[in-house]
Amino acid sequence: MTALIETIEQASIKLKANVYFDGKVVSHTITTREGERKTVGVIYPGTYKFNTDAPERMDILGGACRVRQAGEKDWKPYGPGTTFRVLGKSAFEITVDTGLVEYLCTFEEQ
C-alpha cells in the first residue's frame, strides 16, 4: 500500500472533462510542472474496459474496485492507497460495485 496522494502542486488542468461510458467515468487532464501527464477522476458503479496506448499507473484514492488485466482470468481487488500498472498497447477492465472510485492515472514513459 502506498501513501494517499492528496495534492499536486503547480500543475495545469484542462477544464474540459474527459467523459466516458455515458458519464459513468469522468476525469480531468493534469500536466505537472515537470511535464508529466496525469488524469484525476471518478468512476461510478459498473464494469468498463479501457485500452491503453502508453503504460499507465493507477492510484486508487478512494472507494473500492476490482481490476482484470488483458489476458488474465482473475479479478484483483484495489482500495484507497493501492496502485496497479497497465502495460502500453494493452487493456484492462475495472468494476465498481457500489459507491464511487476516485483515482489518479499517471501516463508513464514507454
Please report, for each region that a protein language model flagged, where it lies by residue.
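A short, N-terminal "cap"/entry segment at the start of jelly-roll beta-barrel domains
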Residues: 1-36
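Acidic, Ser/Thr/Pro
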Residues: 4, 22, 27, 40-44, ...
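Short hydrophobic/aromatic-rich beta-strand segments that constitute the beta-sheet cores
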Residues: 50, 67, 103-105
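Short, conserved beta-strand element in jelly-roll/cupin
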Residues: 52-67
